[in-house]
């Protein structure tokens, strides 16, 4: 008989709680260390979608580097909502950071016209990768480092476009679950209009993250925390979770493992990059 996990719901939620003030200090120190100390770069550039993840990263960058050293890029497509643009502007106004708006419609549609019957998923991936192309090009123009904005829940669930959202070399919120992103955002003063709206990639009308994933962020975070702690599905269900949701989350984690790694290299020597050739900073 399987043992019942000694982790009632309130203990699981307690494990997800963060010390927001301490987390802010650590993440701003992390950004200063990664940019200024390790790379000798003083400026950051990030895509600002109007969502909570990029909003929080903008706040962290402004605190770490000073608002004068943070450059946001809004990259709307023709189907992007005006609300998203307005919310991005709220962040710019609140922080006093620089911001450019670069339309990606012509670039995306120019490719899609030559593509073979692009479905909504392919279209969304093209949009995400085009935004990353713009971000890296603008980083070269500005002499600024691109900063990632993906959270841990999305990364574990594989809910991101490979070689797009995961591409920037530094990500201050990649180890924060979505519920922790909400908590830190409230602590740092991100506008409530951004915090309280339903999370959406804004790739098509009426699309929401939770609708795409098939589970709420709160439920996903609770289940993910137990999966990462090593509990089996039956043990997690014994706490009170729906077994179908547990299986959905685990399936997403296991089927997208490849997205969280660099491309697999065939080893033909004892000095393969990222396998044997590692510097101390890589450990």
Regions found by a protein language model. Name each.
Residues 1-46, 56, 60-64, 68-74, ...:
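ATP/NTP-dependent adenylation/nucleotidyl-transfer catalytic domains that generate, transfer
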Residues 51:
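Conserved G/P- and acidic residue-centered "switch" motifs that form tight phosphate/ATP-binding loops
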């Amino acid at each position: 008989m399987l043992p019942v996990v000694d982790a009632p719901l309130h203990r699981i939620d307690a494990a997800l709680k963060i010390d927001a003030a301490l987390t802010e200090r650590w993440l701003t120190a992390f950004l200063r260390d990664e940019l200024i100390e390790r790379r000798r770069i003083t400026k950051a550039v990030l895509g600002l979608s109007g969502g909570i993840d990029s909003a929080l990263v903008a706040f962290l960058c402004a605190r770490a580097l000073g608002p004068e050293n943070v450059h946001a890029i809004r990259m709307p497509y023709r189907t992007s909502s005006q609300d998203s643009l307005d919310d991005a502007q709220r962040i710019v106004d609140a922080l006093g950071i620089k911001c450019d708006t670069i339309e990606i419609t012509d670039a995306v549609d120019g490719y899609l016209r030559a593509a073979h019957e692009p479905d909504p998923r392919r279209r969304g991936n093209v949009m995400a990768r085009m935004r990353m192309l713009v971000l890296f090009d603008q980083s070269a123009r500005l002499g600024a480092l691109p900063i990632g904005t993906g959270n841990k829940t999305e990364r574990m669930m594989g809910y991101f476009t490979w070689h797009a959202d995961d591409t920037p070399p530094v990500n201050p919120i990649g180890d924060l679950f979505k519920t922790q992103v909400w908590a830190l955002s409230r602590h740092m003063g991100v506008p409530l209009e951004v915090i309280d709206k339903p999370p959406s990639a804004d790739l098509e009308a009426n699309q929401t993250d939770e609708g795409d994933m098939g589970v709420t962020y709160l439920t996903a975070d609770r289940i993910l925390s137990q999966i990462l702690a090593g509990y089996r599905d039956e043990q997690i269900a014994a706490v009170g979770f729906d077994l179908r949701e547990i299986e959905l989350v685990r399936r997403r984690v296991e089927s997208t493992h490849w997205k969280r790694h660099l491309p697999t290299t065939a080893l033909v020597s004892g000095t393969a990059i990222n396998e044997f050739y590692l510097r101390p900073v890589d450990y």
